[in-house]
């Protein structure tokens, strides 16, 4: 049986992205990864939807039964700044994690290359280049205007020196059976990125 490391030095990033700007947000993420690694982080965890930011309080012009034109433009801007799970931005994160020798958890808005659907996703990346994507199963409340329900890529478990690692996104951590699904896989590290500072977190 493999001997697991007893401790993990984790850097929990509490920073604001450059909203609706994936290029500048990615630059900031890479700088923060470098800083965390200089401070001996082994695991770096970013918030929910760090790339390209959580559109907190935005309506995207939506009311029940109608949408406004300016809201559609807001949504299009957000869509254009969402990332492909296997796109060049994600590859930059994979490459940087490898160069730094760290594990990474990155919250991002994923754009599906086939369907065009957006997903609230979290990518776990290992220093050997492995990348495992988790899509939020059911967006919370009005998030459903922006992101779709996961049909694949959920509950992946990544092997790490500290044991199996997995993630649930924000409100998913309130779902007992979602947690049970991870516990049944024997996880040692449970990452639950969110985007706010509500008292329950």
What are these regions (language model features)?
Residues 13-20, 72-82, 161-165, 189-195:
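Short, basic, glycine/proline-bearing loop/turn elements
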Residues 14, 48, 172:
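Acidic active-site catalytic centers that drive phospho-/nucleotidyl reactions
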Residues 3, 84-85, 89-98, 110-189, ...:
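Active-site catalytic loop in hydrolytic enzyme cores
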């Amino acid at each position: 049986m493999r001997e697991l490391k007893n401790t993990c030095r984790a850097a929990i990033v509490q920073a604001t992205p450059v909203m609706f700007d994936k290029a500048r947000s990615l630059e900031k993420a890479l700088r923060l990864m470098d800083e965390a690694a200089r401070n001996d982080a082994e695991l770096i965890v970013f918030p929910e939807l760090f790339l390209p930011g959580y559109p907190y309080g935005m309506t995207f012009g939506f009311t029940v039964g109608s949408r406004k034109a300016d809201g559609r433009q807001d949504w299009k801007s957000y869509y254009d700044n969402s990332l492909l799970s296997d796109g060049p931005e994600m590859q930059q994160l994979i490459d940087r994690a490898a160069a730094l020798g760290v594990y990474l958890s990155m919250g991002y808005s994923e754009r599906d290359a086939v369907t065009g659907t957006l997903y609230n996703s979290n990518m776990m990346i290992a220093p050997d280049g492995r990348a495992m994507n988790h899509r939020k199963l059911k967006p919370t409340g009005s998030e459903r205007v922006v992101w779709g329900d996961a049909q694949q890529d959920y509950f992946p478990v990544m092997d790490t020196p500290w044991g199996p690692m997995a993630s649930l996104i924000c409100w998913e951590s309130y779902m007992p059976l979602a947690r049970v699904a991870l516990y049944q896989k024997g996880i040692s590290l449970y990452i639950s990125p969110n985007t706010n500072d509500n008292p329950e977190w």
